[in-house]
């Protein structure tokens, strides 16, 4: 059995994490209204890598504007988000850790006040 301090290689990519310690995806609601990362969120996640985690996972990140599930959720759907995402990945990788994004779509739970559109679902659901 592998120890938590053992390296871990992802077979498909060949990337190697320095250890098996993983920051789980946690909702911290620190992103800006347009889905861009705030300095606070970048700093918080980067500090996990600096502290020795081998893999740092982001909070849920919506892949389309209408998939946002709550206030403060980061997005990965627009070019305007790339500078912050690049800064985050670079900061994590500089400490030898691997960065992972938890992709997400809020489905029928997306608040219309955030998305501006009626929520979508894979099946017919009652809204009341």
What are these regions (language model features)?
Residues 1-106:
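N-terminal capping/small domains of soluble enzymes
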